[in-house]
Amino acid sequence: MSNKTKFLAVGLVASAAFFTSLIKYEGYSLKPYKDTGGVATIGIGSTKYEDGTSVKITDKPIDQKRAVQVAQAHISKDEQAFRKSLQGVKVAQVEYDVYLDFIYNFGQSNWRSSSMLSNLKAGQYVAACRSLLKWKYVAKRDCSIRSNGCYGVWIRQVDRYSKCMGANL
């Protein structure tokens, strides 16, 4: 399958490349920690458990197997809402993975109100890719500035943008 072939999003699922990239950027933290935005996080960047309970900094550590379970549950919920938001829209597998990763990182509500989604619905794929670069702020800090302490967020956005553009040019 070509990296540029587009399919209805309803028929796609997160690829192995999605999970590899997720682990690359989120890593494994078996103990709760505060993420760049100050939110309690555990495992592979999870802020909530399967039942919707928020991670607390005082939660007990988990093992790697449990980290994967929690992340898969989070991704599964995100995917359902993601596919629904893209009814009738065709995307390449790479785009599906990129935007799902965005949702995992920034949340469903940010996705639903984003210019990425409106551009995709309008068939403006390159504009949707470019919209990724607008998302460079965390806790009012510009993450494209290395000294702001959130540069990894920007690096991840640039990676998403590059992958997305690769599927569209």
Feature-to-residue mapping (PLM):
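Generic structural motif recognizing short loop/turn segments at the entrances and edges of beta-strands
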Residues: S29, T36-A40, T53, T58, ...
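Mid-length scaffold segments of soluble, non-membrane domains
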Residues: K60-S115
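Acidic/histidine-rich, surface-exposed loop or edge segments in extracytoplasmic proteins
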Residues: G45-D63
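Long, amphipathic alpha-helical surface segments
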Residues: M1-G11, A17-G38, S46-K48, K65-A73, ...
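Small-residue-enriched, tightly packed secondary-structure blocks
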Residues: G38-A40, I44, Y96, L100
